[in-house]
């Protein structure tokens, strides 16, 4: 039975970025400036022994429910689900979800961005839709279903209905997600100011394909020409200085499957350095749009 939210119940904004390594953001000593995340860390808590599964669906199922991914039947990504217990991708209703729990306790709820927890064979318009966000306690869903999407021509769903992205050469999905999240947050403040909200914001730009705006990629021109071996050394030094890792921490040996930077020819170095620039531009743009959403909350 639903309850009214307690007086003074806080609004909640939960953000999950995608494929952002421990050493990527400046918040944890990385080479990519993420001022929004830096600010959150300075005014909140920063964990350095937090566990993820390093896979989309399992990590997301665990965060969404507070339960181990095998309990959620999501031991692997949904596309690789099997019929075995813990791996069939059919997240049980007994797991509950943050959306459902908070909705039952008087919150308005919305999800913006990536959902990689719908079983692969249930993602069409034939349904069923009982594992889509709108069936997990989220009154509003605007985003995409699956592991990735084109950022200029995304496969968007509003609820369970597919919608077309605007035919605009300046359109970008990451900015669009932020726009929709901001609009919803402002609506909550104007239409239901006495009712708390829970917004789950899950951008997917830092997962391939890395379709970052050109102007954001350009910000990192030449920043990674030193190569990945030197980058590892510089990152570890920053992490030690920040206290993210203990003093005296040593780099693990470079995996044999990854060649040394110096063994690459000039064309390969140019390509790989540009790939790093593109990823950096992607993360920086995500951080910028997260900042826009947080600013709307603070308003």
Label every PLM stretch briefly:
Residues 1-299:
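Formylglycine-dependent sulfatase
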């Amino acid at each position: 039975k639903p309850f009214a939210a307690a007086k003074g119940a806080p609004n909640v904004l939960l953000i999950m970025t995608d494929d952002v390594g421990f050493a990527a953001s400046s918040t944890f000593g990385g080479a990519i400036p993420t001022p929004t995340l830096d600010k959150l860390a300075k005014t909140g808590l920063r964990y350095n022994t937090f566990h993820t599964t390093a896979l989309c669906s399992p990590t997301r199922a665990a965060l969404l429910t507070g339960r181990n991914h095998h309990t959620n039947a999501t031991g692997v990504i949904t596309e690789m689900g099997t019929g075995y217990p813990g791996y069939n991708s059919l997240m049980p209703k007994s797991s509950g979800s943050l959306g459902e729990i908070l909705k039952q306790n008087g919150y308005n709820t919305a999800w913006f961005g990536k959902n990689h927890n719908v079983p692969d064979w249930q993602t069409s318009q034939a349904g069923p839709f009982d594992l889509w966000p709108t069936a997990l306690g989220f009154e509003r869903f605007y985003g995409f279903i699956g592991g990735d999407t084109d950022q200029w021509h995304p496969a968007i769903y509003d609820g369970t209905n597919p919608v077309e992205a605007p035919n605009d050469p300046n359109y970008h999905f990451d900015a669009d997600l932020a726009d929709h999240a901001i609009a919803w947050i402002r609506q909550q403040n104007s239409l239901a100011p006495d009712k708390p909200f829970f917004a789950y914001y899950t951008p997917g730009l830092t997962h391939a394909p890395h379709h970052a705006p050109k102007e954001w990629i350009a910000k990192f021109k030449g920043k990674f020409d030193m190569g990945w071996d030197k980058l590892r050394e510089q990152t570890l030094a920053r992490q030690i200085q920040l206290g993210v890792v203990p003093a005296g921490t040593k780099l693990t040996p470079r995996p044999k499957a990854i060649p040394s930077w110096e063994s690459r020819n000039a064309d390969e170095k140019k390509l790989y350095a540009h790939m790093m620039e593109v990823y950096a531009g992607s993360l920086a743009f995500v951080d910028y749009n997260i900042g826009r959403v947080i600013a709307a909350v603070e308003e």
